[in-house]
Design a protein with these regions (language model features):
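Positively charged, small/polar-rich N-terminal and surface patches that mediate targeting and assembly
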Residues: 1-88
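Helix-biased detector of long, well-ordered alpha-helical tracts
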Residues: 86-345
Length: 345
């Protein structure tokens, strides 16, 4: 049986304990060094075949041990997965039915400006942040101590597998709340799904990925809306909370400020290359690991330094979002290319 799964635990001791218990049950498992592109706290992971995934789940239930991550081998790439989705992910290729990938499907800024120009604004004294500065989310004051953050983000898949796509899409949507200085409270699923092409099981795994990311963020699932469409689209409508006087905006940067990025650049380049079959396996795995990493911890650190301006870098890239920040702040941005953090490939 081909071993096509890597199961990550928090320590070498746990890996060895699970390996012994699994072998006692006749499972073909082995403790192996973690590949460079797979994040492991201890450097050792458990290798097993997807055919034994259910049996390994039973072993883990008995031991009361949960893996910190699971990766499935697809070609030469290790892609985020779960023991439950190990077989489903092999049956579909999400990007085959999509003309665009991820935020690359966004309409251009110029087109949006043309369409919105002349339309009336529905203003209110309690609307703290609206559409004027193209910020990451809207903010509405409820009381002197509490404001609600409203944002939505959905996109076509930029990876082939359902579970990691769900995780990535949810992380993108939640990031807008942290970019405004807030805390995610609740989210709703937004889905357009080609049922005949992909079948119901792939949808379940997309939603599973989104749900696990929501749980990691501390937000709850409050419902959703699904339609049957020609292409797969998935994302979230997210509600968050923030103090009205502590809202972060994409405007407010001052001359002399340093530009700090919470993640390395290059994920869009890697996923676009992967769609064309031109990306190396380790590069795809590294990119997916970063795309599923939440900006929550970075936001906690930013609170301590009281930033002048904050924005979420996604579909328009660093240059596009830096230009938005410069325009909203009334100043210029100077980028030193050699200083920009890029994926370690």
């Amino acid at each position: 049986i081909q071993r096509n799964l890597l199961v990550v635990f928090g320590s070498v001791q746990r890996v060895m304990r699970v390996e012994r218990a699994a072998r006692d049950r006749g499972l073909d498992v082995d403790a192996v060094p973690a590949p460079r592109s797979v994040s492991s706290e201890c450097g050792v992971v458990l290798e097993i075949g997807s055919a034994d995934a259910d049996a390994l789940t039973d072993v883990l239930d008995i031991l009361k041990i949960e893996p910190t991550a699971v990766y499935r081998k697809k070609g030469e790439t290790w892609t985020p997965s779960t023991l439950e989705t190990a077989t489903v992910d092999q049956l579909v290729k999400l990007t085959e039915g999509s003309a665009y990938g991820g935020c690359g499907a966004k309409l251009s800024k110029g087109l949006l400006h043309t369409v919105l120009c002349g339309l009336p604004r529905l203003a209110s004294d309690d609307l703290i942040v609206g559409i004027e500065s193209a910020d990451d989310a809207g903010v509405v004051r409820l009381t002197d101590e509490l404001a609600l953050i409203h944002t939505t983000d959905f996109s076509p898949p930029l990876v082939d597998d359902p579970y990691p796509f769900g995780r990535i899409a949810a992380a993108n949507a939640l990031s807008d709340v942290w970019a405004m200085g807030g805390t995610p409270l609740a989210a709703k699923n937004l889905v357009s799904y080609p049922l005949k092409q992909l079948g119901k099981e792939a949808l379940k795994e997309v939603l599973r990925g989104g749900l696990e990311t929501m749980a990691e963020s501390g937000a709850v699932l409050a419902g959703g809306h699904t339609v049957e469409g020609q292409e797969l689209l998935y994302g979230l409508a997210v509600t968050g909370t923030v103090h009205p006087d502590k809202v972060w905006r994409n405007g407010g940067a001052l001359p002399g400020d340093a530009l700090v990025l919470t993640k390395p650049l290059g994920t869009g380049l890697v996923t676009t290359a992967a769609k064309g079959g031109m990306a190396e396996a380790d590069h795809v795995t590294t990119a997916m690991r970063w795309m599923t990493t939440l900006n929550r911890d970075a936001a906690v650190i930013l609170v301590e330094v009281d930033p002048h301006a904050v924005t979420d870098v996604t579909g328009f890239g660093l240059a596009g979002h830096a230009a938005e920040m410069a325009e909203a702040s009334g100043c210029a941005v100077e980028l030193e290319l050699e200083a920009l953090p890029a994926l370690s490939l």
